[in-house]
């Protein structure tokens, strides 16, 4: 198997094909969708596939990926259809609550993320002092959040486990499988929203920033049409991932750790909150670095910023920033980046 593209909320893979593997894939997709729906009441729409010959991939790959995109869009714009069919009786059962059973686990997870530096992925639940372990959707895969203090040297399920190390390797020797990943803003304590208010220029507000890449789909489609090697897509994916995770984390640690929180940064977009003055400065720095890094690509960034008080619901602030981001995308000038703000 080969990962062609994996960034943000999407991925593309090449898998060997036979009838048995297709049957297993269809069953796996149905199982994952059902478990995601039962846990989050949402449908995972990215799990689609098409069958292709090697000759087609080597000569005309674009129609294959276009067909895959059509299938994804079909699921995306008919949300929850299959899941609602399967869960019809459950939805109409008296006394059921819309609250997801995983909400309490996610609350604990979110509260602990700021201090955690490692995530252990295992097929068995790991227990220990001050250790948080969850099994989202109950697929038989556990995610345990660890610190340097409770990081085990060894445990029973080593053969079926992987330790994900974020940003820097631990001091102790790890005897089981591990991999190093970068995650912007991970492993640091968080400030409160009240701490992030900035009163400079007489405006006491917090800045909420949403930013993502423009024209990425067009760039990939152009690469398909030019018959570039499939490995080039994997390279572009890794390049974007490195930018939004490693490079931004380095800048944040150096200049903005005391005034900005990175809620999410990965793939081709980001979501940050902080001092509104420094959020604007950070956005400018990110854009300048992006232009330097991807100068040979026809891609750019658009951003939306909302300025809110500390007690303003963060979800609504994020929606406002996303709306302003959409306005920025409609700026209309070629090779010109757009930032839209909402106050």
Spell out what each predicted region is:
Residues 1-343:
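Regulatory and interdomain segments flanking nucleotide-handling catalytic cores
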